[in-house]
Swiss-Prot record:
InterPro entries: Ribosomal_uL5 (IPR002132), Ribosomal_uL5_bac-type (IPR020930), Ribosomal_uL5_C (IPR031309), Ribosomal_uL5_CS (IPR020929), Ribosomal_uL5_dom_sf (IPR022803), Ribosomal_uL5_N (IPR031310). NCBIfam families: PRK00010.1 (NF000585). GO terms for cellular component: ribonucleoprotein complex; ribosome. One of its GO terms (molecular function) is structural constituent of ribosome. Belongs to the universal ribosomal protein uL5 family. This is Large ribosomal subunit protein uL5. One of its GO terms (biological process) is translation. Part of the 50S ribosomal subunit; part of the 5S rRNA/L5/L18/L25 subcomplex. Contacts the 5S rRNA and the P site tRNA. Forms a bridge to the 30S subunit in the 70S ribosome. It comes from Staphylococcus saprophyticus subsp. saprophyticus (strain ATCC 15305 / DSM 20229 / NCIMB 8711 / NCTC 7292 / S-41). The keyword Lipid biosynthesis does not apply.
Length: 179
């Protein structure tokens, strides 16, 4: 079993039950899924760029990405409805905990001038969104093989009802928030 999953089952649930006075252990918020999205605007002119992004996203997450397509045509971007413009991966279960562990322990500390992640990036329903400016922070990405530095969005979806519960859940997992 994954290190974070064991920590959740042994320590985090008890701590959250005490802190928020839950009547049952089943009320404790859990991480439901993690969605990693990479928008590739350059894919409109050159579809090879999208293949590189898909390859990198697969290396980072260990799962084959879904190619996202444009919902609307936008003339100023020379974009037609249905054109491939990005890739996303939805992680659940074991892979989700592996990715979160790698993100917290390895990748975030590799960010340049890292002070911690924002405490305010919650959406009001207990979900946390994190923007990463470059894919090079992940150990699976080889610096020499990267043709363009791309960012990505990481959304951590929890079953928490409030942002405060979700913030506490993530900080119990070791998420480095701003002081």
């Amino acid at each position: 079993m994954n290190r974070l999953k064991e920590k959740f089952n042994s320590e985090v649930t008890q701590n959250l039950v005490k802190q928020f006075d839950y009547s049952s252990v089943m009320e404790v918020p859990k991480i439901e899924k993690i969605v990693v999205n990479m928008g590739v605007g350059d894919a409109v002119q050159n579809t090879k760029v999208l293949d590189d992004a898909v390859e990198e996203l697969q290396a980072i997450t260990g799962q084959k990405p879904l190619i996202t397509k444009a919902k609307k045509s936008v003339a100023t971007f020379r974009l037609r409805e249905g054109m491939p413009i990005g890739a996303k991966v939805t992680l659940r279960g074991e892979r989700m905990y592996d990715f979160l562990d790698k993100l917290i322990a390895v990748s975030l500390p590799r960010v340049r001038d890292f002070q911690g992640v924002s405490k305010t990036a919650f959406d009001g329903r207990g979900n946390y969104t994190l923007g990463v400016k470059e894919q090079l922070i992940f150990p699976e990405i080889d610096y020499d093989r990267v043709n363009k530095v791309r960012g990505m969005d990481i959304v951590i979806v929890t079953t928490a009802n409030t942002d405060e519960e979700a913030r506490e859940l993530l900080s119990q997992f070791g998420m480095p928030f701003h002081k």
